[in-house]
Amino acid sequence: MGLLKRAAGFAAAAVMASAIAFAAPKIDEPAIWTIQKPNGTTITLFGSVHLLPDGDGWRTKALKDAYEAADVIVMETDLTEMGNSDVANYLAKNSLNPPGVTLTKLLSPEQKATVEAAMDKAAMSFSSMEGYKPWFSAIQISVTYAVLQGFDPSQGVDKAIEADGKSDGKAFAYFEKVREQLDVFIELPEDEQITFLVLGAKEILTRPDEMEKLVTAWATGNVEEIDKLMNRGMEGSPRLARALLADRNARWTKEIGEFFMKDKNSYLIIVGAGHLAGDESVIAMLRDEGIEVEGP
C-alpha cells in the first residue's frame, strides 16, 4: 500500500472518524542514523511514521539523546500551516472537481466498483466524495481507513517531536511548505490521479494489513521491509513515485550537504521513514556524495 501510506499524512488533520482497536507492535529499536560533522557537531536522521497507534515507546535513548543535543530540528514541513486559512482555501480550491464533473463521470464502471468497495471498508459513502478530485479522494480513503484500524493522526512521530520542540524552545527548520507538498498531487494529470485512486483502492481490498506491517517494520528497525512496503509499492504510478520520493530526496540531500554539513549546529532531522529506506533514499544519496553515515 505504498502509494496511500506515503500520501496519508498530507490530509490526516482533516479526517474525523471513530477508531477501533489496533494491536500495536512491541517497539524494539526504530532505525536511526548519525553523521559526525568535521567540526564535531552531529546530524541525526530518524524516520517518522505519520500515523501511529497510541503510545510513545518509539522514544528510544538514542532519539532522546539526539533531541537533547539538537540545536535545530528539521522536518518535512510545518504541520501547523494546515490550520492557516490560506492553505485551507488553497486546498479547497484545488481538491474540488469543476462544476458538472463528478467522480462517477471520471471513472469507468469497473473502477467505480473498486473504489466504492474500498470506501465501504473505510466506512465511507461514495456520494460523499463525488465532488472531489481523484487525488483527494484517494488520500481521504487512506487516512479514514487507517484511523478505523486504530491509527491516530495526532500520534505521528513528527507531530509529537514538533510539539515537544516548540514547548522546549527548540529552533526549527523545514524542507518544504505545505503548499509544495499539496502541489505534488494537485499537479498530477487527471489520468494519473485516477490510477493513484484505483491502485490505492485495490491495495485496501487485497492487502488490508499493510499499515500494520509498516508500523511493525518501522518499530523493529527493518529498513529493507520499509523500503518494500512503502517505496516498491509505488511502481504503479511512476510519476507520483518520482515526485513524492526521488525528487524530494535529492533536494533534501543537497540541502544537507550544502548547508547543514557546513555550519556549527547539531541537527535532528525527522522525515517519513520511506525517505530513509532504499536505493533512492536520503541515506543512500548522502553516502553516494561521500558523506559517512552511521546506521543501517
Model feature map: region roles:
Residues M1-A11:
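Bacterial N-terminal signal peptides that target proteins for export
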Residues A7, A14, V147-G150:
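Compositionally biased, intrinsically disordered low-complexity regions
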Residues G9-A21:
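Hydrophobic helical h-region of N-terminal Sec-dependent signal peptides
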Residues V15-M16, W58, V282:
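Alpha-helical transmembrane segments and their juxtamembrane interfaces
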Residues S18-A19, K61, M285:
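Residues in and immediately flanking transmembrane alpha helices
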Residues A24, A31-L244:
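Structured, acidic catalytic/metal-binding patches in enzyme active sites
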Residues P238-P296:
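A cross-kingdom marker for long, charged
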